[in-house]
């Protein structure tokens, strides 16, 4: 069974603004696609979450990262997509990940 790509909006400023739904999604994902592991790590540390695998997605890695994400989703993993701030797919390299998942017929939330 295929996994699911979960788009997770993150606070633009205050980490206290992170929704409960986002916290639940972050805690259940097998891996997280992110632009900057430092910023994502700060957010996860704030939530008391650790041990997540990161897939770095930026203008230099988005092609290879897209392929890796699709392979992992096809293997049944749940992968979260976060940005440094805001909703994934708006002014960030996550768009390619979303397009690859859709093209492969995978589930998105």
Model-derived regions: residue spans:
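Glycine-rich, highly charged phosphate/nucleotide-binding loops
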Residues: 60-70
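Glycine-rich loop at the start of a catalytic domain that most often binds anionic cofactors/ligands
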Residues: 46-51, 68, 73, 94-95
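Structured beta->alpha junctions
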Residues: 58-61, 85
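Short glycine-cluster motifs
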Residues: 74-109
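Glycine-rich, flexible N-terminal cofactor/catalytic loop recognition
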Residues: 1-59
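Generic recognition of short, well-ordered alpha-helical segments
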Residues: 17-21, 67-68, 92-96
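Switch/connector loops and helix/strand junctions flanking conserved nucleotide-binding motifs
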Residues: 16, 41, 64, 90-91
């Amino acid at each position: 069974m295929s996994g699911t790509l979960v788009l997770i909006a993150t606070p633009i400023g205050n980490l206290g603004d992170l929704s409960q739904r986002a916290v639940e999604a972050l805690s259940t994902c097998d891996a997280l696609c992110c632009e900057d592991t430092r910023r994502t790590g700060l957010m996860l540390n704030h939530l008391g979450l650790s041990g997540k695998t990161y897939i770095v997605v930026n203008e230099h890695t988005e092609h290879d990262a897209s392929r890796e994400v699709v392979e992992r989703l096809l293997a049944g993993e749940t992968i979260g997509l976060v940005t440094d701030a805001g909703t994934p797919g708006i002014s960030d390299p996550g768009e390619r990940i979303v397009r690859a998942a859709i093209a492969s017929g995978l589930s998105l939330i």
